[in-house]
Amino acid sequence: SPHTKEGDNNMECVRKLTKDLYWVGADDRRLELFENIHPIPRGVSYNAYVLLDEKTVLFDTADWSVCRQFLENVEAVLAGRPLDYLIVNHVEPDHAASLQEVLIRHPETKVISNEKAFDLMRQFGFSVDDRAEVVAEGDTRKFGKHTIAFVAAPMVHWPEAMVSFDTTTGTLFSADAFGTFGALGGRIFADEVNFERDWLDDARRYYTNIVGKYGAHVMDLLKKASALEIKMICPLHGPVWRKNIPWFLDKYVHWASYEPEEKGVLLVYASMYGNTESAASVFAARLAEKGMSNIHMYDVSKTDTSYLISDAFKYSHIVLASVTYNLNIYPKMMTFLDHMRMLNVQNRYVGIIENGSWACTVGTLMHDYLEDEMKGMTILQDSVTINSSMTKGQNRSMDDMVDALLDSMKEEKK
């Protein structure tokens, strides 16, 4: 693999993916919030790739935070060769922020992307007009042995997004599709880690919160992908896929079609003094007693919404337990409901537990919001109403709602 001369200070960190394709990305473990909203305790990777053919090709750039490492990686792989082409699949700044730095260092480089992408580059202040080569759906470019085909992927998850497919090797440069939160730590391939155990939750949380709204567009891309002989997937975040690709594609089909991965219950509660939490705990215990132990219970005030959204996509049933607050839905619960709406969560069974010491309105408000603002939500007719704290008087309604939820699990969600 290419290296700098002995004595140089460059500290490149690259991985060879195939005989002429290199990963030149970098990890960021300092960033607390992805898009300044989603916690990423395990960090994130910004992936970019260099192809060494008769012509050299860089696929995307990297976030400003890792620009120095990224540039050193690119130069190390080029090993003195010019950079002939930069293909921009996605203009979001976490992948395009270093674009101008690349062009300053390589005045010879031509930039290949689509019309909408070039519009966005100009909006972000990049000077690309004198180097732009516009491509559209179905166009191809030959760089020597390798031919790259360009496939539009609008709203996955920005309007200009596209993916690039190396028809020679079956490598899909998939932009933000098939991405994952989490720094790579040297392990570039998904088969170098226990992905299902250690990475799948972050892959789901990434998809559902970043791309989740655009399921129909993702399904369109998956249909296009199914016509390709994909042997490797190189996303802009997270591990590269070279094995078990159908398994990961199947996860995407579930998420993009808003179909649950498994029968289970996401139980989210909003409680000020512990009384609504107690009722939620009783509900969970009775559910488990009757054989449904796949229950995942969260305090909406403590757990970040991104984790709740991830589980809302994963499980078939959602139970919302909330106290009334200023004659309204508890603000943190309202935030969760709003995120579910924005991210298009649909086709779920929902149970409601409401609490209020006076004027208990939250159950009706949540019911109406789910019914009016969201798609395909089946709200269980049996609900539980508590006035301040649970009493024996609520045992019957609690049991009825448990039974209603279990009965609904036997039904086939259409």
Segments (PLM) and residue ranges:
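Short, Lys/Arg-enriched N-terminal segments with co-localized hydrophobic residues
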Residues: 1-10
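Conserved beta-strand hairpin/beta-sheet module of binuclear metal-dependent hydrolase folds
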Residues: 14-75, 163-166, 170-174, 276
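Metallo-beta-lactamase
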Residues: 15-19, 112-161, 214-220
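Active-site metal-binding motif and surrounding structural segment of the metallo-beta-lactamase
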Residues: 54, 65-112
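Active-site neighborhood of phospho(di)ester-bond hydrolases with catalytic His/Asp-centered motifs
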Residues: 59-61, 83-91, 111-114, 172-176, ...
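Short acidic active-site motifs
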Residues: 98, 303-308
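Active-site-proximal loop/helix segment associated with metal-binding centers of metalloenzymes
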Residues: 157-161, 169, 177-212, 256-260
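FMN-binding flavodoxin-like domain, especially the glycine-rich phosphate-binding loop
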Residues: 184, 195-233, 237-240, 282-298, ...
